[in-house]
């Protein structure tokens, strides 16, 4: 028991249970009857809390400095309403005993503030309700709605500006992260304020309804239950009801004012006092003009001379003081410049790792006319397509592609975009931001009016048309593609060609974690057989030739077995390809038939001799064997021809070669004829039928 008590007290000291207990106590006031003395304390606390919130709202330099305000607004509104319930219970049960039955605070507001006259009190209460409900609350609610909408609409532009500053080196990564959090917090704050303003409005409506209920109920109870005269019942219950209403409505008005001040703040430089000094009182000429007007009114017969003369003197003195400030500012300017220079020189020396911007694996920069493609209001078309590209590439290669960052770049042309891989520009293009791309197909007939151009990704001739021409282009057989899809297709092409470069050590860890979940013992054996450097070479060799790492269990099994014979990453990759031969050849097979080109005997013998001689002379990688320049020129002309001939025949371009020649010829195919797939004899499954279309000579 003692231990439990100590733990509970420790939680209280840590502040973990403080707020929940306060909320539970507030809710308990609805059920439990409260003595008048406790009501006095709670009403006083309610007024003090409202004053504190108002002062914090006035002194806050920007709304995010008081981000807790929506929550406080909800709690204080709930507290005020529960106090209304508790005080109503006391007034109706014990109001016949006299005005002091509901507590000293309610009695004081009923007697002192409204002079003991229930008519005056009723009028004052109605005026307060009009000010609170119609003026302050209504305006704050509207401003909250507009601020929330505009803040959400401005988020993409603010994020782009942060990314632009980061790219330009104006801020570091930590500062960019802080700014992004501020932008998100600002959106959350104004969204919460939009809802919190409904609390204030509901509180004002509830105050009017509670007043009416207390008024009618109290008078009826006094007359019919306690046999009071109508005049005595009105005098007694109405004064307590009005006092109760004023005690609740004054804090409500203070909080409504605080809410209005928070949502109307547009400056991030200082509090309200600072803004008043630097904006309202900044111009001496305005103050002198107001001084003259006050003096003229003071000398008009029948006017109260003293108040106008006092304000005339006060405004004149303020204007004179403000006119002296520019001179003082000039006197301090030189010392300020010296101080600024010293600070700048000191800050320039504070260079650390944190100030060096990190290189992002993949990023897409947009000109300002293309920024609309990532606008939430338009459905984020580019963001969604880029996310789809990342998903498809990750699924196809069996590795998680890094996130593709999208940002605005003011250095680009308005309709230009650029794709960066590891911080280096891989490609760029300029497309009409407000047009659609019409791509001709085999079923296209006729020509459509538009701007002729080329597809940024593949260089095919296209026509850029207006959105209104889309239906016509589709009817003519064109494929119509929007700007977001054009950019996403280009990103897809570029990223696929850089997959091996994007695969790094951390990806090996994630890949092996995946393997451990499926085959824990195999993962341990693989880690013992090959280190990360060796594995990275093997995985990159496979990805370079488009071999997916999805079947990591089979790949790991082969690597563990083959690593006892060799550590050469090319030979290890060849063994993996042999194990995955069915998945590798599957895209090229038509009806169990594989159509290929081969090497003629003369070329095959020549290349075999070159490879054998190179290996005898020293350790040379199979894909880096030196070849005669004339033979390279021959490959440069014949390999593209083989590729085009097979594509023209409707076949997948495949070149079948001996195993020891495959790494070398696959490298040349990537250089001279991208898309020409090089297979070795032993990579063809036994059940397939080979059809030789020709021979490379």
UniProtKB/Swiss-Prot annotation:
Q: Which Pfam families match?
A: FHIPEP
Name the predominant localization. membrane
Q: Where in the cell is it found?
A: Cell inner membrane
Q: Give a yes or no for keyword Cell membrane in this entry.
A: yes
Mind listing the GO biological process terms from this record?
bacterial-type flagellum assembly; protein secretion
Q: Which family does it belong to?
A: Belongs to the FHIPEP (flagella/HR/invasion proteins export pore) family.
Q: What does this protein do?
A: Part of the flagellar gene cluster Flag-2. However, the Flag-2 flagellar system could be inactive in strain 042 due to a frameshift in lfgC.
**What name appears for this protein in its UniProt entry?**
Putative flagellar export/assembly protein LfhA
Native species of this protein? Escherichia coli O44:H18 (strain 042 / EAEC)
């Amino acid at each position: 028991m003692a231990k439990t008590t100590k733990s509970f007290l420790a939680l209280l000291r840590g502040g973990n249970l403080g707020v929940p207990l306060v909320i539970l106590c507030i809710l308990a006031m609805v059920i439990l009857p409260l003595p008048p003395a406790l009501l006095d304390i709670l009403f006083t606390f309610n007024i003090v809390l409202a004053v504190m919130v108002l002062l914090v709202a006035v002194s806050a330099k920007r709304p995010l400095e008081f981000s807790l305000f929506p929550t406080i607004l909800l709690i204080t509104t709930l507290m005020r309403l529960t106090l209304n319930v508790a005080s109503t219970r006391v007034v109706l049960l014990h109001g016949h005993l006299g005005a002091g039955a509901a507590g000293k605070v309610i009695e004081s507001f009923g007697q002192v503030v409204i002079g003991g006259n229930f008519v005056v009190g009723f009028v004052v209460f109605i005026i307060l309700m009009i000010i609170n409900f119609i003026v302050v609350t209504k305006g704050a609610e509207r401003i909250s709605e507009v601020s929330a909408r505009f803040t959400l609409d401005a988020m993409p532009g603010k994020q782009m500006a942060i990314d632009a500053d980061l790219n330009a080196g104006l801020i570091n990564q930590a500062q960019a992260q802080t700014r992004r959090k501020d932008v998100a917090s600002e959106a959350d704050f104004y969204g919460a304020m939009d809802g919190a303003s409904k609390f204030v409005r509901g509180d004002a409506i509830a105050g009017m309804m509670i007043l009416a209920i207390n008024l009618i109920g109290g008078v009826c109870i006094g007359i019919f239950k306690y046999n009071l005269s109508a005049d005595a019942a009105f005098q007694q219950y109405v004064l307590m009801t009005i006092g109760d209403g004023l005690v609740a409505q004054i804090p409500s008005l203070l909080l409504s004012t605080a809410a209005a001040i928070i949502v109307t703040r547009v400056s991030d430089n200082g509090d309200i006092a600072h803004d008043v000094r630097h904006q309202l009182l900044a111009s001496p000429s305005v103050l002198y003009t107001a001084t003259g007007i006050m003096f003229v009114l003071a000398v008009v017969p029948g006017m109260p001379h003293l108040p106008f003369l006092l304000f005339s003197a006060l405004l004149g003195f303020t204007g004179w003081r403000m006119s002296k400030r520019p001179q003082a500012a000039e006197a301090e300017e030189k010392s300020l410049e010296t101080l600024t220079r010293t600070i700048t020189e000191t800050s320039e020396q504070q260079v650390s790792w944190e100030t060096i911007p990190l290189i992002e694996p993949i990023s897409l920069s947009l000109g300002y006319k293309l920024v609309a493609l990532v606008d939430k209001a338009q459905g984020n078309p580019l963001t969604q397509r880029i996310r789809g590209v990342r998903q498809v590439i990750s699924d196809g290669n069996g590795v998680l592609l890094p996130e593709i960052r999208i940002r605005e770049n003011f250095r680009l042309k308005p309709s230009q975009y650029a794709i960066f891989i590891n911080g280096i520009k891989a490609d760029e293009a300029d497309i009409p931001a407000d047009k659609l791309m019409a791509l001709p197909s085999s079923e296209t007939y006729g020509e459509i009016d538009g701007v002729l151009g080329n597809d940024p990704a593949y260089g095919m001739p296209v026509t850029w048309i207006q959105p209104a021409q889309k239906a016509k282009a589709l009817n003519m057989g064109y494929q119509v593609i929007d700007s977001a899809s054009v950019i996403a297709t280009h990103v897809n092409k570029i990223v696929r060609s850089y997959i091996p470069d994007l695969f790094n050590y951390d990806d090996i860890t994630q890949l092996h974690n995946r393997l451990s979940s499926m085959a824990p013992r195999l993962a341990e054996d693989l880690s013992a057989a090959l280190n990360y450097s060796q594995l990275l070479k093997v995985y990159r060799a496979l990805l370079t030739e488009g071999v997916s790492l999805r079947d990591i269990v089979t790949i790991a099994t082969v690597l563990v077995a083959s690593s006892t014979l060799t550590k050469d990453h090319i030979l290890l990759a060849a063994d993996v390809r042999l194990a995955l031969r069915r998945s590798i050849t599957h895209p090229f097979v038509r009806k169990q038939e594989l159509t290929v080109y081969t090497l003629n005997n003369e070329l095959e013998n020549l290349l075999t001799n070159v490879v054998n001689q190179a290996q005898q002379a020293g350790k040379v990688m199979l894909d880096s064997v030196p070849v005669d320049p004339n033979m390279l020129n021959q490959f440069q002309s014949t390999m593209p021809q083989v590729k085009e001939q097979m594509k023209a025949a409707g076949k997948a371009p495949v070149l079948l070669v001996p195993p020891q020649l495959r790494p070398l010829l696959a490298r040349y195919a990537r250089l001279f004829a991208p898309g020409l797939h090089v297979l070795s004899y032993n990579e063809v499954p036994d059940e397939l039928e080979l059809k030789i279309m020709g021979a490379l000579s």
